[in-house]
């Protein structure tokens, strides 16, 4: 069996601009994002840590690393999903996030689940 199929995690993202928590006059733009992590591989895997790269429109980069997500290190058996919501604050109305989750499969193999780049944007800023 191909390694790629054995250890395969799909990640999808939904984002929202939080106007009530943002203050554009103070260069504070707050976004929520909901991540769905799905194990489409053939072995169970546990999310151990995360690594985010957050870039605003001025190319200011923040890197965030830490254990788990929202205080959890979920174990995903084949076919299972885990969903969580979190947020990010930027100094510009548009930015991007991308990164990876560090996973450990039940057989002890360690691998990264890549989080594809996604856009955070205040409504009516992007055309």
Curated annotation (Swiss-Prot):
GO biological process assignments: error-free translesion synthesis
Pfam families, per the entry: DUF525 (PF04379)
UniProt domain ApaG: residue ranges: 3-127
Cross-referenced SUPFAM superfamilies: ApaG-like
Coiled-coil residues: none
PROSITE patterns named in the record: APAG
Listed HAMAP family: ApaG
NCBIfam families with a match to the protein in the record: PRK05461.1
Official protein name in the record: Protein ApaG
Organism encoding this protein: Thiobacillus denitrificans (strain ATCC 25259 / T1)
């Amino acid at each position: 069996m191909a390694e790629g199929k054995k250890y395969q995690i799909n990640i999808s993202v939904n984002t929202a601009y939080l106007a009530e928590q943002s203050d554009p006059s103070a260069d504070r733009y707050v976004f929520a994002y909901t991540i769905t992590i799905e194990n489409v591989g053939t072995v169970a895997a546990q999310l151990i840590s995360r690594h985010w790269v957050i870039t605003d429109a001025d190319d200011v980069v923040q890197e965030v690393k830490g254990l788990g997500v929202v205080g959890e290190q979920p174990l995903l058996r084949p076919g299972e999903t885990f969903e969580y919501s979190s947020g990010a604050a930027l100094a510009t109305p548009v930015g991007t996030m991308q990164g990876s989750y560090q996973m450990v499969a039940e057989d002890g193999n360690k691998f990264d689940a890549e989080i594809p780049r996604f856009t955070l944007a205040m409504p009516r800023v992007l055309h």
